Every structure is written in structure tokens, then in C-alpha cells.
Amino acid sequence: MLRVRCLRGGSRGAEALHYIGSRLGRTVTGWVQRTFQSTQAATASSRNSCAADDKATDPLPKDCPVSSFNEWDPLEEVIVGRAENACVPPFTVEVKANTYDKHWPFYQKYGGSYFPKDHLQKAVAEIEEMCNILKMEGVTVRRPDPIDWSLKYKTPDFESTGLYGAMPRDILIVVGNEIIEAPMAWRARFFEYRAYRTIIKDYFRRGAKWTTAPKPTMADELYDQDYPIHSVEDRHKLAAQGKFVTTEFEPCFDAADFIRAGRDIFVQRSQVTNYMGIEWMRKHLAPDYRVHIVSFKDPNPMHIDATFNIIGPGLVLSNPDRPCHQIDLFKKAGWTIVTPPTPIIPDDHPLWMSSKWLSMNVLMLDEKRVMVDANEVPIQKMFEKLGISTIKVSIRNANSLGGGFHCWTCDVRRRGTLQSYFD
């Protein structure tokens, strides 16, 4: 915190004025008195300034609007994204590395244009229904500002159009009473933070901490321009070798590559999160939080919550198609590893930016309530066997934009305290 040092006119200043007055005689006595009075006034003003400065460093209020330590405490307030004006990102190297080849012609044809209008309208309706159900469950819902993402912008290093304000999980992470803006890694997402600034400024004024991670330049050096991608097998080999489209030129990360369990936060090195970004988070959150790197057998690592989703104290969903290499860490801590069933989303349903495993991308309202897709009956039954009641909402069309319930939300406030689940 920047402090302002207060300068006060002390006893030496008064002695100096008295000396001057006695030497110059009565002709300047009035001047001396006025000067002394001015000094006293300045001192009082300085003290008032200090009081204002002290006020700026007061402790956070007990009713801070931002407070969340994990993924399962009772949910009180959440940000839900918007599908309005969502645009297909330009087909750049980082987009190519994060999408499947069957969709590449779609990006090449429509990059910079809006997603199909009919599909967007259906997605908007689904998310509105999701918001209504959350409100009925007693959750306060906040929404980002609507923005025209088709506008072209240019920096000294690149030019692009935008993507959307649909997935607050990708750009925001709440750790305790602090809300952190992720720097992101796609050029199409460079200005995505603008959609959330109205909300974040409100939280800040009401007592929350607000941190913006270092913004990358997204210059060519951040990306391996010759990243070889031709097949899923290529991706498996590259990921196994620790090779990703993002380099270590500068820190970058998406918030959705992190998942919280009290004092322990887990993160993967992915196509959008590099080691410099992870190290920035590790240093920023130390010593209160411990950041652990985990990895998976995943040909396209991007965002952890459709691969490894912590849903309760000692309870985690682990994608059977992408096994965790560090799963013994959780087993030794006594955690229960749950394997979700294969998703049943049809093969012909468009998933331009994700896989079918969005079925496990669920939002916990508390330890015993989960928001799950109404079409995914197998995973509903799995939760019921775990003693968790399901709140069913259909967001199939919203899935096409790259996210499930966890992605479409950022939990701002959960009723709970900071605890350790690994000590």
C-alpha cells in the first residue's frame, strides 16, 4: 500500500520563527505571527490528510461481497456470463492448437463474424433460464456488460476481433476476499475483462480486493508459430513432451486452469497457461495458499474443470479419458475419486470449442446440491448415488460456445471459511 508521509511543523519551526521575530523587531512581528499561524494551519491540514490516508488502509468490512475459498461451500452470489454478440475468433495459431481439426473450416470461414444467430438465440434463452433457477435457489446473480465483440482492435503487436463475455470462469478467480483478473492467452480475448469491470468496481468499492495479473503483450514470441498439429496423436505426443503452443516469453494464464480446495489450489500447464503464469500466481498467493501443478493424459489441455472437478471436501470427479498423473496425492490424503459416466451428448451436436465432457463441468450450490445438464441422465444418477440432489437445467446450445455450468459462472461469494483439506 502506498503511504503518504506527513510533514508537521514541530517545535524547531516555532523556535525559528520566534528568533526571526526578535531579531527583526516589531516591524515584522505581524508577519511572523501570520507565518506561524499559516504553519499551524498547514500542520492541521497535513494531519487531516493522514487521517484520510489511514482510512484508505482500514481492514476489509466483515460483510465483504467477495468471499470464496473452494468449489462447494453454500453459494450466495455468482456471476453468470452472456452469449449475446459472441463472435467466432480469428483462426490464429493459438486457436488452432485448442480446437479440433473437424472444426477448422468453420473458423476459417466465420472467424471475426458472429456465431450462428439461431444458435446464439437458443443459448441466450438457456442461460436466462439458468439464471432464473439460480435465483429461485436463493443465489444472487450478476451479469457482465453486453459488448459488441465483432469490433476490430489493434495493439502494437497484433490485431484481432473479440470472442465473448460468456465464460467468467476463464477470466476471473476468487481467492478469499480477492478477485483476480487473469491475463488470458488468446488474442481474441485480450479485452474480455471490459465486460466485467462494472461488477468488479462495485465489489472493490464495497470492500473486496481487486488484482489484475500482468497483461501479456501477446506478441508473436508468446506463441510457437510452427507448432505442429495434424492429428490427436500429434497432440498426445506434444503434450507428453511438455510442448504447448504458448511459450514462456511472458506470463499468461486462464483462471479456468485453476481449481480451489481451501489452502490448496491445483493448476495445469496447458495451451493457455504457462509456467510463468503459474509462478506469478504461486508468488502472489503465498504464503496463505499453496499452488500445486497437476497434469493429465490430455491431447488438448485447456481448462481443468472438464478434466478434474473438485465437488466437495475430499471428493473429486476425475475424467476417465484424461487420467491424472498425480492422483496418488489425493488418494494418500484420503480423498474419494469418482469416475463420471460417459456423456451422452449426440455426435452431431456442434461443440466448436470443447468436448462432450462438459457433462462433468457442473456447479455445486453446496455439498448436497449440484446444477447439472437436464439431458445427462447418467451423471444425474451418479450424483444421486453420492447423496447429492440434482438441479436440472438444459444448456446444450450454450455448451457449443465452450462451457458447462462451471465455465459459465464465477462464484463470487460462498458461505465458508479458509481450511486445509490436505494437512
Curated annotation (Swiss-Prot):
<dbReference type="GO" id="GO:0005739">
    <property type="term" value="C:mitochondrion"/>
</dbReference>
<keyword id="KW-0496">Mitochondrion</keyword>
<keyword id="KW-0808">Transferase</keyword>
<comment type="similarity">
    <text>Belongs to the amidinotransferase family.</text>
</comment>
<dbReference type="GO" id="GO:0015067">
    <property type="term" value="F:amidinotransferase activity"/>
</dbReference>
<dbReference type="GO" id="GO:0015068">
    <property type="term" value="F:glycine amidinotransferase activity"/>
</dbReference>
<dbReference type="InterPro" id="IPR033195">
    <property type="entry name" value="AmidinoTrfase"/>
</dbReference>
<feature type="modified residue" description="N6-acetyllysine">
    <location>
        <position position="385"/>
    </location>
</feature>
<dbReference type="GO" id="GO:0007611">
    <property type="term" value="P:learning or memory"/>
</dbReference>
<feature type="active site" description="Amidino-cysteine intermediate">
    <location>
        <position position="407"/>
    </location>
</feature>
<keyword id="KW-0007">Acetylation</keyword>
<feature type="binding site">
    <location>
        <position position="170"/>
    </location>
    <ligand>
        <name>arginine</name>
    </ligand>
</feature>
<feature type="binding site">
    <location>
        <position position="355"/>
    </location>
    <ligand>
        <name>arginine</name>
    </ligand>
</feature>
<keyword id="KW-0472">Membrane</keyword>
<feature type="active site">
    <location>
        <position position="254"/>
    </location>
</feature>
<feature type="modified residue" description="Phosphoserine">
    <location>
        <position position="46"/>
    </location>
</feature>
<keyword id="KW-0999">Mitochondrion inner membrane</keyword>
<feature type="binding site">
    <location>
        <position position="305"/>
    </location>
    <ligand>
        <name>arginine</name>
    </ligand>
</feature>
<dbReference type="GO" id="GO:0014889">
    <property type="term" value="P:muscle atrophy"/>
</dbReference>
<feature type="transit peptide" description="Mitochondrion">
    <location>
        <begin position="1"/>
        <end position="43"/>
    </location>
</feature>
<feature type="binding site">
    <location>
        <position position="322"/>
    </location>
    <ligand>
        <name>arginine</name>
    </ligand>
</feature>
<dbReference type="GO" id="GO:0005743">
    <property type="term" value="C:mitochondrial inner membrane"/>
</dbReference>
<dbReference type="GO" id="GO:0005758">
    <property type="term" value="C:mitochondrial intermembrane space"/>
</dbReference>
<comment type="subunit">
    <text>Homodimer.</text>
</comment>
<protein>
    <recommendedName>
        <fullName>Glycine amidinotransferase, mitochondrial</fullName>
        <ecNumber>2.1.4.1</ecNumber>
    </recommendedName>
</protein>
<dbReference type="GO" id="GO:0006601">
    <property type="term" value="P:creatine biosynthetic process"/>
</dbReference>
<dbReference type="GO" id="GO:0120162">
    <property type="term" value="P:positive regulation of cold-induced thermogenesis"/>
</dbReference>
<comment type="function">
    <text>Transamidinase that catalyzes the transfer of the amidino group of L-arginine onto the amino moiety of acceptor metabolites such as glycine, beta-alanine, gamma-aminobutyric acid (GABA) and taurine yielding the corresponding guanidine derivatives. Catalyzes the rate-limiting step of creatine biosynthesis, namely the transfer of the amidino group from L-arginine to glycine to generate guanidinoacetate, which is then methylated by GAMT to form creatine. Provides creatine as a source for ATP generation in tissues with high energy demands, in particular skeletal muscle, heart and brain.</text>
</comment>
<comment type="pathway">
    <text>Amine and polyamine biosynthesis; creatine biosynthesis; creatine from L-arginine and glycine: step 1/2.</text>
</comment>
<feature type="active site">
    <location>
        <position position="303"/>
    </location>
</feature>
<feature type="binding site">
    <location>
        <position position="354"/>
    </location>
    <ligand>
        <name>arginine</name>
    </ligand>
</feature>
<keyword id="KW-0597">Phosphoprotein</keyword>
<keyword id="KW-0809">Transit peptide</keyword>
<feature type="modified residue" description="Phosphoserine">
    <location>
        <position position="49"/>
    </location>
</feature>
